[in-house]
């Protein structure tokens, strides 16, 4: 089997290495977001037909306004939300503190965590309280498009 570069081959279209398909943020929110977060990759059914939606980002600072992500639900899809520490010697240490609310319960995350939000469960607000080193964030929704209302303020 030959090893191909990511621009050639029948299935190269399935390899996403940027966030070009991410929804456009309004200008005011983008200014705030870019100061604490760096989106890495975004995939959904528009970027790769048939794919479900996934977002990845690094959080490396506390937002100037918190909470920035507000409570919402996804009535027709489950979601996974992850926060992973970046210390390879201690991967369970989050390297910061995130307050994440699910079902009306606020939880303080200090360890690498994945949260399951089944369809219909209210989740967020989310507050980034402390960042000692970058925190890897991802979210996965089990449908082709993230079509909910804006979850930020």
Regions found by a protein language model. Give the residues of each.
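Short Gly/Pro-enriched loop/turn and capping motifs at secondary-structure junctions
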Residues: 87-89, 122-124, 143-146
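Conserved short histidine dyad/triad with adjacent acidic residue
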Residues: 53-86
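Extracellular structured ligand-interaction cores
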Residues: 77-81, 95-97, 135-137
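A short, N-terminal "cap"/entry segment at the start of jelly-roll beta-barrel domains
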Residues: 1-66
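Conserved metal-binding segment of the jelly-roll/cupin
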Residues: 102-128
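Double-stranded beta-helix
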Residues: 1-15, 128-153
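A short beta-strand-loop-beta hairpin characteristic of the jelly-roll/cupin
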Residues: 83-110, 148-151
